[in-house]
């Protein structure tokens, strides 16, 4: 593609050199640059791409997009100066890959909890309807039934647009995507055209990056502020920030709720460990999911599918066939009648939701034993809160390691224990080895009890000192049970 065609997507401050050159590819990683490519220098949280301009030129880059043109420009290289390289990168990438989001309906899901479940269930629902569908999520990316491994909730703009381009080439008609607060703040979704957006809820998370809940809220809200006029914004009225999210959007606003009058109204009629009986807009349906939070997730899926043009009755039929997402309230039964639940709950609110769901089914007929940790090099403020919430709603608590990353596991555990009082401590153990912690919970459990293993869910690794070691909560439980 000619450089001057690419530049139509942005408003450069200035261009020095030839803008009619052929660009063979676009890159933000100097190590991956090939001959004839455009290298785009971004200022990241860890490094500044401007420092790698010489390396990119050495690798064969013929054009450089940057905020500051080097003091000694290299002859024969075209320099494009922009005010905001973060914003420009997404727009350039989407243009280079043929504006893929104009070729299908793209729906983004944002919020603290429920993103993966809602995006994945929408993907499964529209595959049930017979469409070719794409999914971009924390667990895995899919182009129809072909899995593509994932590193972040939302990939960098180049990877993201390349993936969306593949989805368009493969004939996907719908794409469902988790949209993280990081990706909104870092403009990774700049240039994408959304057909709709869904807001789930907002509770404490990622404060290691956003610093304050207000900044975190602003990042989420920006997604809806930028939503186009002909798109829909579907927001959760049961969250106090539900209407805040959509107050400045140009899109059409719709609401869903389990508590209030809304466009999509739901309620739980019955709940047990095999599933729930629900009422959505005065239609009854039986589903294989547990917990109010899952009823809310399914209601969002129902609403979005209807807003994408499907009949309510057809959507309800599709929902009744769906299975829970990997690592999300994943139940395993032991031969002696103990139920273990593996769940990704890694925020205080998610933990409360899962524990409430367990108590809603148990109705006081069994003990709850919770195994929980907290991630290293992440928001330390939530650690004592996680432990306190676990203690409040459990008969026994075992504080253990999650992904310690570059921190000492015992120090993370100590941060968590600081949230407990003397009464809580009587029912709490701390075991740094996660496998031993799970084994201990299994030894303590009797027939009719429930063990919650929280925090890692679908993850099949434990990250220690920069190395990912194989570790799967579900595998460990099955091994102990059998």
Swiss-Prot record:
Its EC number is 6.3.2.13. It is found in: Cytoplasm. It catalyses: UDP-N-acetyl-alpha-D-muramoyl-L-alanyl-D-glutamate + meso-2,6-diaminopimelate + ATP = UDP-N-acetyl-alpha-D-muramoyl-L-alanyl-gamma-D-glutamyl-meso-2,6-diaminopimelate + ADP + phosphate + H(+). The modification N6-carboxylysine is found at residue 220. Its main location: cytoplasm. InterPro entries: Mur-like_cat_sf, Mur_ligase_C, Mur_ligase_C_dom_sf, Mur_ligase_cen, Mur_ligase_N, MurE/MurF_N, UDP-N-AcMur-Glu-dNH2Pim_ligase. One of its GO terms (molecular function) is magnesium ion binding. ATP binds at residues 111-117. GO terms for cellular component: cytoplasm. It holds the Pfam family Mur_ligase_C. Its cofactor is Mg(2+). It comes from the Bacteria. GO terms for biological process: cell division; cell wall organization; peptidoglycan biosynthetic process; regulation of cell shape. UDP-N-acetyl-alpha-D-muramoyl-L-alanyl-D-glutamate binds at residues 30, 153-154, 180, 186, 188. Meso-2,6-diaminopimelate binds at residues 378, 402-405, 455, 459. A motif (Meso-diaminopimelate recognition motif) lies at residues 402-405. Keywords: ATP-binding, Cell cycle, Cell division, Cell shape, Cell wall biogenesis/degradation, Cytoplasm, Ligase, Magnesium, Nucleotide-binding, Peptidoglycan synthesis. Belongs to the MurCDEF family. MurE subfamily. Catalyzes the addition of meso-diaminopimelic acid to the nucleotide precursor UDP-N-acetylmuramoyl-L-alanyl-D-glutamate (UMAG) in the biosynthesis of bacterial cell-wall peptidoglycan. This is UDP-N-acetylmuramoyl-L-alanyl-D-glutamate--2,6-diaminopimelate ligase.
